[in-house]
Amino acid sequence: MPEQHPPITETTTGAASNGCPVVGHMKYPVEGGGNQDWWPNRLNLKVLHQNPAVADPMGAAFDYAAEVATIDVDALTRDIEEVMTTSQPWWPADYGHYGPLFIRMAWHAAGTYRIHDGRGGAGGGMQRFAPLNSWPDNASLDKARRLLWPVKKKYGKKLSWADLIVFAGNCALESMGFKTFGFGFGRVDQWEPDEVYWGKEATWLGDERYSGKRDLENPLAAVQMGLIYVNPEGPNGNPDPMAAAVDIRETFRRMAMNDVETAALIVGGHTFGKTHGAGPADLVGPEPEAAPLEQMGLGWKSSYGTGTGKDAITSGIEVVWTNTPTKWDNSFLEILYGYEWELTKSPAGAWQYTAKDGAGAGTIPDPFGGPGRSPTMLATDLSLRVDPIYERITRRWLEHPEELADEFAKAWYKLIHRDMGPVARYLGPLVPKQTLLWQDPVPAVSHDLVGEAEIASLKSQILASGLTVSQLVSTAWAAASSFRGSDKRGGANGGRIRLQPQVGWEVNDPDGDLRKVIRTLEEIQESFNSAAPGNIKVSFADLVVLGGCAAIEKAAKAAGHNITVPFTPGRTDASQEQTDVESFAVLEPKADGFRNYLGKGNPLPAEYMLLDKANLLTLSAPEMTVLVGGLRVLGANYKRLPLGVFTEASESLTNDFFVNLLDMGITWEPSPADDGTYQGKDGSGKVKWTGSRVDLVFGSNSELRALVEVYGADDAQPKFVQDFVAAWDKVMNLDRFDVR
């Protein structure tokens, strides 16, 4: 569908002809205008302050886990079933059942997930907000959510939209005869859209995300702006099933699905319902975010016929896949392989395939009792038949439908839970007992935890082991900072810092200190566990974090502060067999400004990548600032590089980073090595410090400099230590869903 309003354009330099960087006129802040209009390339620190507490109408004391636990899930299922099977005149149900629509709604909510940064997915209920609520691929899903309002209204705070959207899809499958694998509640609603990079394109269905032969830009997964997966008409509307198979494989891979899971999801999902392309697409009105006020948040209002029911237009494709569109069976594959196919067009002018030579005419039921139809398929459906790998998989299912049911159940379960993180976050009576490899399992605690006396003893042993403050802090940070708040993966729990692939990540300097630290901590663990009384044990994962805490206490003492860094035991150690190496590989940081590491192939300069990392760690701007300053003086840099170590007292927890960054006696200039680093020279012209773009941005950016001035003041040292320890403790426990 063409964009209703052309995007604002800029000149190549970002400045208008009169020297002003804004084209057109400035907008009021309430219209979205502001500093970013004047300086488009400035750091957007708002990405660190998303969904603030003041925006949450439920209040700080609200406990969603406690509320959702009170729901009678059987009664909820019946309520959703009633909605699904009660057609509404304002949006009539195809075949009298909204189940297929709800499956699409759930699929498209969860299907925005992508592996490279873990963003997207159903958590937070983001489908309610722009841009997702107005993506072309989500046309008419605004109606699906409105249909569910009576259910949401009834359960109120006990049931989030995020859970309801996905659970409705699960219920739809069950309602139409399919046995699902299970379901976990626990998705908490957010109250504003996430700031997520969905692509560089400024028009719907743009595809500037490709380079080379057909290399898709990271971290994106969908093929075009505004699509969830692939273009159902084929690549850029080219109805070539073999070419479409290439897009399908790459796109689904980037959403964590292998070939079997991909085929199962397509076959299973297209066993139900239909697409909608009853008439010309240019008769469809604007998406929800561009629709007139009086449409009350609904979009895509069509002037073709009644605009609904038999006249509905969504994708523009008019396909009914099976002769039993509200029943689980094997008819999709039977029809896919039972006919030869010819290229045709829908009434809306979209490419699709129809059974050749009129075969099967009249065998497909009309959704509203009209004459029977001919079998039809999408170009991407035929990909399952023409691609050799997909063909081998799906032909077997043609003869073994029970295998299809099993694979679809598991793939659907993965699809709708992939962004939820560990099973400790899954709530409710429908959670399966089985934990799957993609859920990054960690063993349950099977021993007594260490207490204060044991913790004190272990700290002493660690500090007496010969390991330095730098080594201990770096290792603990490397383990814990692998966490991603987007999909709740990574973190210190599991002790995977010593397993593949993490132990070999370049950012962890695998040929440097890491293996020595691992070996030493393992020796301490073995010695302690063999001598500890009763069933008291300590895990390697706990020792990694405890080592960092002990090192910080030592560094604080060196700076004149006697502190205790919080430590919460209870982490356990995963095995290599419990760790999917390929799946974990996408967690490898390509940049970590906290360690002054910048790998190759990053899309933005280092300071922007720092913000992205801080966002994934759910840090605020003050937390990010205090952590960078503290980690620099503790010597936690990648390969112990001197960049940003603005202190003469390394491994001492001082505020020297901030004090020296603000020193007006230092003049900064790019390094003659032309390697992206900078030299800070004193009045004599002597190089006193070296720094990276990440370091200097804290003095250059006005908002970050304001924070630096807090920690660089003469009275700031106690506050700096306090705030650093609090931020450190937060990062160390980001993955501890077992205790929060």
From Swiss-Prot:
Pfam families in UniProt: peroxidase
Gene Ontology CC, one term: cytosol
The protein's required cofactors: heme b
GO molecular function, one term: metal ion binding
EC number: 1.11.1.21
Catalytic activity: H2O2 + AH2 = A + 2 H2O; 2 H2O2 = O2 + 2 H2O
PTM summary: Formation of the three residue Trp-Tyr-Met cross-link is important for the catalase, but not the peroxidase activity of the enzyme.
UniProt key word Heme: yes
Binding-site residues for heme b, renumbered to this chain: 270
Cross-link (Tryptophyl-tyrosyl-methioninium (Trp-Tyr) (with M-255)), chain numbering: 107-229
Alphabetical UniProt keywords: Heme, Hydrogen peroxide, Iron, Metal-binding, Oxidoreductase, Peroxidase
PROSITE patterns assigned to the protein according to its UniProt record, in alphabetical order: PEROXIDASE_1 (PS00435), PEROXIDASE_2 (PS00436), PEROXIDASE_4 (PS50873)
Enzyme class at the top of the EC tree: oxidoreductase
Cofactor comment: Binds 1 heme b (iron(II)-protoporphyrin IX) group per dimer.
Per UniProt, location of the Tryptophyl-tyrosyl-methioninium (Tyr-Met) (with W-107) cross-link in this chain: 229-255
Site keyed Transition state stabilizer: positions: 104
Superkingdom of the organism of origin: Bacteria
Function: Bifunctional enzyme with both catalase and broad-spectrum peroxidase activity. May play a role in the intracellular survival of mycobacteria.
Similarity section: Belongs to the peroxidase family. Peroxidase/catalase subfamily.
Database matches in NCBIfam families: cat_per_HPI (TIGR00198), PRK15061.1 (NF011635)
Quaternary state and interactors: Homodimer.
Protein name, entry field: Catalase-peroxidase
